[in-house]
Amino acid sequence: MQDVVTPAGGVWVHWRDYLTLTKPRVVVLMVFTAIVGMFLASPGQVPWVALTVGSLGIALAAGSAAALNHLADQRIDAIMARTRRRPLPSGHLRPLQVLGFSSLLGVAGLGMLALWINPLTAALTFASLIGYALVYTLYLKRATPQNIVIGGAAGAAPPLLGWTAVTGSVDAHALLLFLIVFVWTPPHFWALAVARLKDYERADVPMLPVVYGERFTRWQILLYTVLLLAVSLLPWATFMGGWLYLAAAVGLGGWYLMLNVRLLLTPGPRLPMRSFRFSIIYLFGLFAALLVDRQLPVWLGA
């Protein structure tokens, strides 16, 4: 059902085009890590306002950044087979519509965080939005094969934002959650870049495999996976998580490591996509284990 009218040109636009702009699957994972950050920052139950308004504000700001990414990348998206059906290159939406939609989400999200959560969370969320939508998308993505390593800081912010939404401050445990997502980001995106290498070459985007080749990138994926496995043990070592979390970190990390060893040894596009997809399961599972390990005694009234 088409239910949004765009006055310019009288073109009917499906509401799903606007939803697509927000990259909802990415935002869901980001907000989930933010919620885990909230629970880990709380000695008992998370304050209701922080959980609801904070999560919504972070989600709206993330959706705004994603829409700006669509706007900045419309030329690249039109070239790449994976993205040419997105709302802008397909002609379903116009740049001004996307800019207006993104601005609305951004103002709403940041306003909610500033008014009902705390200024620190609003400021960090704004910095993350600018870092992803402008610094990464407009500059780093086109300037260096280390784009995702440097720009990954913006995408790693949600668990830190969740923490500050509850406490109003940053501490070492919050930065540790940030570090996990930060180290996870390069192997996640490099696997996709290997699988879609021809697309990135056509679009002239200097992703790591475009500049240094597949073999080098597969090695980097493996090395970062080893680093990620080590970093993922730090919550257990610092008593943020217990034995349940440790079992999940070792199990999920071991499987991810084995998959990326196979990725190094086996040519072809099938394993890069498997690695990319499993990395999402890995991050969700790791943070879910942290949440359950910390909150299970509270939920059981122990």
Swiss-Prot record:
Keyword tags: Cell inner membrane, Cell membrane, Heme biosynthesis, Membrane, Transferase, Transmembrane, Transmembrane helix
Family matches, as Pfam families: UbiA (PF01040)
Localization, UniProt: Cell inner membrane
Gene Ontology terms describing biological process: heme O biosynthetic process
Residue stretches spanning the membrane: 26-46, 48-68, 98-118, 120-140, 148-168, 174-194, 221-241, 244-264, 280-300
Classification via PROSITE patterns: UBIA
Gene Ontology molecular-function annotations: protoheme IX farnesyltransferase activity
EC class (word): transferase
Domain of life: Bacteria
Pathway: Porphyrin-containing compound metabolism; heme O biosynthesis; heme O from protoheme: step 1/1
EC numbers, comma separated: 2.5.1.141
Reaction catalysed by this enzyme: heme b + (2E,6E)-farnesyl diphosphate + H2O = Fe(II)-heme o + diphosphate
Annotated Gene3D superfamilies: UbiA prenyltransferase
One Gene Ontology cellular component: plasma membrane
Bilayer topology annotation: Multi-pass membrane protein
Function comment: Converts heme B (protoheme IX) to heme O by substitution of the vinyl group on carbon 2 of heme B porphyrin ring with a hydroxyethyl farnesyl side group.
PANTHER family xref list: 4-HYDROXYBENZOATE SOLANESYLTRANSFERASE, PROTOHEME IX FARNESYLTRANSFERASE, MITOCHONDRIAL
Family, per entry: Belongs to the UbiA prenyltransferase family. Protoheme IX farnesyltransferase subfamily.
Miscellaneous information on this protein: Carbon 2 of the heme B porphyrin ring is defined according to the Fischer nomenclature.
Protein name, per record: Protoheme IX farnesyltransferase
Organism: Alkalilimnicola ehrlichii (strain ATCC BAA-1101 / DSM 17681 / MLHE-1)
